């Protein structure tokens, strides 16, 4: 009593406390960062190594394996995968959530250093690492185009100057430059001219390397001066290399230009990048795992004027893709939804109370509670994101509940003629325990979420804490500011036996009377209600098993990512044509705004595309509908496939796959894996629950297998090293020398001119100079035959791995897809030497599915314990929790009605319903117990009176929660995929629970009361003295 009186009779102090809470909240709101979702990125580090010309199998055994053995010893590694292709190896290390990315980077560097002695010689550089996930979609893509600059010069400028500057911006983890390669001097040899002059390829290589050196020459000094010695020991352009003497034939000088075409070109001519049908250099910017995407993008945009000032006038720098506009639009939609929810909730209160003054009280209490929450969010290091703002939207219905319960009870005393301050004190005292019980039991629902580990726990933590803080502040405001305002703003009225019957008041009285009549009938037919109650429990179980499930709602971020997979024997020239064809098909779609793409490098038969869609307001279709439409057109392109997927704000794992979900096959036997992977992929491709099934196992690339006759080689004076060097010099784009420039280092690349290597007959023109100086054709000591070879070799851990990626057809859930895959694997009878498991998002989904029921049970158990403590009873908490089955049935039925799968967002809705619907029972049970204790009523009379007296606040709180969630259901625009499942779950659960719990709760109350009395009689037998 004294506690409440302290705030009621000291209005100035109470107002100042509320003002302080509001001001702190406003300050916190201004300081909070903005993000699409809470920070849930796994720390990921990518290690890269190269050995030009080495086959995928050579890269896997000689480069990847030694690095994996060393990197695998690092503490906190959650998953290690690698992919080796022609001349390149990439190892992805995914660490646990609690691993600091900088500390992990130091361990990675130490592991690379430890493995250095085990790596092969000839590597142009040491392995390097980057603190970024290559499977993540870039947060921004910049393009460079020019009418006068070559692609090589553009690439050089982009990688040497622009990429370095962008990488220094806070939050940027990696700047990947694609579309070409660094400038180089390319030497294209004429094998016939070399043969005529008697010059070997190794002789050319050694001559070039010896002619281009950079060594210290020292200095000359006398007693007065000092002269630094400088020589023309470097050759920097093609024109300087052409006259280089490489051999003397009968006293005549043979110059490089006589036997080769020497041009200023690029290191790797098998690269191409495009933007909207124009050749372009792409700068693909990815953020650090712990960085905020909006802050990082803002930092890049702020740097753009400086970048544009750096570039020459002949270069055009454009933003081809930016992830931030849709994120900002989504957050703006949530903020508007929050404002609408607050307005609707206040409208509900006004319709019930029919008083401007009375409505003003919750109209003040709700904003104070919500705004004050921002201060706590800032102190906790949270952000303004879709989930935290949705928590505040839902909290609107919660925080007004506390104010409604207090206000309605005070208003009841005022209507009975009590003075305002006395009514405020008496009314608050009566419902103080009820409000505390409601709030604490609601917060208790989220305790299991706060203790939940893994990605789901990280994802939901901000939601749970934000909502709990809002409820806590609301509890304080409802017991301090609300009664104070009631006592000083509301006026007492003359006692009247019947309320005024106007408008909503008349409807409410009619509803209350009808409810009273129906409740009497129900209390006389309790067995029928019991059957209905048990039926809802059974229906819950059936619906939960039957409803389709997924991990997270499929988002429409306005960005698509596509992976091209062509025939494994395709040439680079043909692959570049496929890229252009696919880009034209996509660019012609009316919903597409921008298309960029690239191909080449170590994976000639693959490419990547990034598509920016028009804003949601300018297109009718969702991203998935656009993908379905494009899939039909793209399927007509022969010799290649383009797999499209919508970019999501959550992507798990470091695998770069051509679809959203992955199923990984592991084996310690590479032949077994290569035998079973095609069978499994074929079976999965036939499943209607899967779409775009593809695999990263590519072992059907064309290979020319050369077989040396070692006896003949020995007789001819040729060793294997000389023969291999011939092949590397001829076909390997061998980097034979380095050109040092002030801003960068460039290579001299030697190969046989591609004009002479158009087909297999080129091997017949190759020759080796033996120990006697004679030219021996390759065909004298080698035979060749075509064969198949892998284009890539993949590992997970130290096991051979192959990942089958897939998308979901429209109308199919992830649970249906995973069940179909597991069923197919069982039917195929895959041997134990080949193990299959889901990876990435599909793996997290399965882990979440296993913990969902445990989480719900834990939430119910926590609420039960809290209610036990508050009521000092084992029975009454069960009465209160009996409201839950009807709410969950309503939620699951609503999801089925709207064809929405049960996702992590729907799980949040179920958890919220556990907290919402029990409020009705708490209000009934509290008043019934008080009526039995103080009024001397029977249980039947007490619960009947409690139901009628609390009918108005129950209707008000339920409708407030319902209208608070309704804007989530009706919301459209960006981010609605996240909001709608939450709104559907809550609205469906509230409607069903309101229809049933008004009747089931009093029946359950009486059942447990009779049960309690029965046990009391059994335990009250007279004691017989012995």
Swiss-Prot record:
Gene Ontology cellular-component annotations: plasma membrane
Membrane topology reported for the UniProt record: Multi-pass membrane protein
Superkingdom field: Bacteria
Transmembrane segments: 15-35, 333-353, 360-380, 387-407, 431-451, 463-483, 528-548, 853-873, 897-917, 953-973, 984-1004
Compartments where found: Cell inner membrane
Molecular functions per Gene Ontology: xenobiotic transmembrane transporter activity
Keywords noted in UniProt: Cell inner membrane, Cell membrane, Membrane, Transmembrane, Transmembrane helix, Transport
Pfam families linked to this entry: ACR_tran
Predominant cellular place of this UniProt entry's protein: membrane
HAMAP family referenced in this protein's UniProt entry, alphabetically: MdtC (MF_01424)
Subunit relationships: Part of a tripartite efflux system composed of MdtA, MdtB and MdtC. MdtC forms a heteromultimer with MdtB.
Family: Belongs to the resistance-nodulation-cell division (RND) (TC 2.A.6) family. MdtC subfamily.
Protein name (database record): Multidrug resistance protein MdtC
Taxonomic source organism: Salmonella paratyphi A (strain ATCC 9150 / SARB42)
């Amino acid at each position: 009593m004294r506690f409440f009186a302290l705030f009621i009779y000291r209005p100035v102090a109470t107002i100042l406390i509320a003002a302080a809470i509001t001001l702190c909240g406003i300050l916190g709101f201004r300081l909070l960062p903005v993000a699409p979702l809470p920070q849930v990125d796994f720390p990921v580090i990518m290690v890269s190594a190269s050995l030009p010309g080495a086959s995928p199998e050579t890269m896997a055994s000689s480069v990847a394996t030694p690095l994996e053995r060393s990197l695998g010893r690092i503490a906190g590694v959650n998953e290690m995968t690698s992919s080796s292709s022609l001349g390149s190896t990439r190892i992805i290390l995914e660490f646990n959530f609690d691993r600091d990315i900088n500390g992990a980077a130091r361990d990675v560097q130490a592991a690379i250093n430890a493995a250095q002695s085990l790596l092969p010689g000839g590597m142009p550089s040491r392995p390097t690492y980057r603190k970024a996930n290559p499977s993540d979609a870039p947060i921004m893509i910049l393009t460079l185009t020019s009418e006068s600059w070559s692609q090589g010069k553009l690439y050089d400028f982009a990688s040497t100057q622009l990429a370095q500057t962008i990488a220094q911006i806070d939050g940027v983890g990696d700047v990947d430059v694609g579309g070409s390669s660094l400038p180089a001097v390319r030497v294209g040899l004429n094998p016939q001219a070399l043969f005529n002059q008697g010059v070997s390829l190794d002789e050319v290589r050694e001559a070039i390397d010896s002619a281009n050196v950079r060594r210290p020459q020292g200095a000359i000094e006398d007693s007065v001066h000092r002269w630094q010695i400088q020589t023309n020991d470097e050759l920097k352009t093609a024109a300087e290399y052409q006259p280089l003497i490489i051999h003397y034939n009968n006293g005549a000088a043979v110059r490089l230009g006589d036997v080769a075409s020497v041009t200023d070109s690029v290191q790797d001519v098998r690269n191409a990048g495009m933007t909207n049908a124009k050749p372009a250099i792409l700068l693909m910017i990815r953020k650090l795992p712990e960085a905020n995407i909006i802050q990082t993008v803002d930092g890049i945009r702020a740097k753009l004027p400086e970048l544009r000032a750096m570039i020459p006038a002949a270069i055009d720098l454009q933003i081809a893709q930016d992830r931030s506009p849709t994120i900002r639009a989504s957050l703006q939609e949530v903020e508007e939804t929050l404002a609408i929810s607050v307005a609707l909730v206040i409208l509900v209160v006004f319709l019930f109370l029919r008083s401007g003054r009375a409505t003003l009280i919750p109209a003040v209490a709700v904003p104070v509670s919500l705004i004050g929450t921002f201060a706590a969010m800032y102190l906790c290091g949270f952000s303004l994101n879709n989930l935290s703002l949705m928590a505040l939207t839902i909290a609107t219905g919660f925080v007004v509940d506390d104010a409604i319960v207090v206000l309605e009870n005070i208003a009841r005393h005022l209507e009975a003629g009590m003075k305002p301050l006395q009514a405020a004190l008496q009314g608050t005292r009566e419902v103080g325990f009820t409000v505390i019980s409601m709030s604490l039991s609601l917060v208790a629902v989220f305790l299991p979420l706060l203790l939940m580990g893994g990605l789901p726990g990280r994802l939901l933590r901000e939601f749970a804490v934000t909502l709990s803080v809002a409820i806590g502040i609301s509890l304080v405001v409802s017991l301090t500011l609300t009664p104070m305002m009631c006592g000083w703003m509301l006026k007492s009225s003359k006692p009247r036996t019947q309320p005024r019957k106007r408008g909503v008041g008349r409807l409410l009285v009619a509803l209350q009377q009808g409810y009273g009549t129906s409740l009497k009938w129900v209390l006389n037919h309790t067995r029928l209600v019991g059957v209905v109650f048990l039926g809802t429990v059974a229906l819950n179980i059936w619906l939960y098993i039957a409803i389709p499930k997924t991990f997270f709602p499929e988002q429409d971020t306005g960005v698509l990512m596509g992976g091209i997979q062509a025939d494994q024997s395709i040439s680079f020239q043909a692959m570049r044509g496929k890229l252009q064809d696919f880009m034209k098909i996509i660019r012609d779609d009316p919903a597409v705004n921008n298309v960029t793409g690239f191909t080449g490098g170590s994976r000639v038969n693959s490419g990547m595309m990034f598509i920016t869609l028009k804003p949601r307001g300018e297109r009718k279709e969702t991203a998935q509908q656009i993908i379905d439409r494009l899939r039909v057109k793209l399927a007509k392109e022969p010799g290649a496939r383009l797999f499209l997927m919508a970019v999501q704000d959550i992507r798990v794992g470091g695998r770069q796959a051509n679809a959203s979900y992955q199923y990984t096959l592991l084996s310690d036997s590479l032949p077994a894996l290569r035998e079973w992977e095609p069978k499994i992929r074929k079976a999965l491709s036939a499943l209607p629950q899967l779409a775009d099934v593809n695999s990263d196992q590519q072992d059907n690339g064309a290979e020319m297998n050369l077989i040396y006759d070692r006896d003949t080689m020995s007789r001819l004076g040729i060793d294997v090293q000389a023969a291999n060097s011939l092949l590397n010099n001829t076909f390997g784009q061998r980097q034979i020398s380095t050109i040092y420039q002030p801003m960068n280092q460039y290579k001299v690349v030697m190969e046989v001119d591609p004009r002479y290597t158009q087909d297999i007959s080129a091997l017949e023109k190759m020759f080796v100079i033996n120990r006697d100086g004679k030219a021996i054709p390759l065909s004298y000591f080698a035979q060749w035959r075509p064969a198949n070879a892998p284009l890539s070799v993949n590992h997970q851990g130290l096991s051979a791995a192959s990942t089958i990626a897939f998308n979901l057809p429209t109308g199919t859930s992830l649970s249906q897809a995973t069940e179909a895959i597991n069923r197919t694997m069982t039917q195929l009878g895959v041997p134990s030497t080949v193990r299959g498991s889901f990876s990435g998002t599909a793996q997290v989904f399965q882990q979440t599915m296993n913990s969902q029921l445990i989480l719900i049970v834990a939430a119910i158990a926590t609420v039960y314990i809290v209610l036990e403590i508050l009521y000092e009873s084992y029975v009454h908490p069960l009465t209160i929790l009996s409201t839950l089955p009807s709410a969950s049935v309503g939620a699951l039925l609503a999801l089925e009605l709207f064809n929405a799968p049960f996702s992590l967002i729907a799980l949040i809705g179920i958890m919220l319903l556990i907290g919402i619907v029990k409020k009705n029972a708490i209000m009934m049970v509290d008043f019934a117990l008080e009526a039995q204790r103080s009024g001397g009523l029977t249980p039947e009379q007490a619960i009947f009176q409690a139901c009628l007296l609390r009918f108005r606040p129950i209707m008000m709180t339920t409708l407030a929660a319902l209208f608070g969630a309704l804007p989530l259901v009706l919301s459209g625009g960006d981010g609605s995929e996240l909001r709608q499942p939450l709104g559907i779950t809550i609205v469906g659960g509230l409607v069903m629970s309101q229809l049933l719990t008004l009747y089931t709760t009093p029946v359950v109350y009486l059942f447990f009361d009779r049960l309690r009395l029965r046990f009391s009689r059994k335990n009250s037998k007279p004691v017989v003295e012995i």
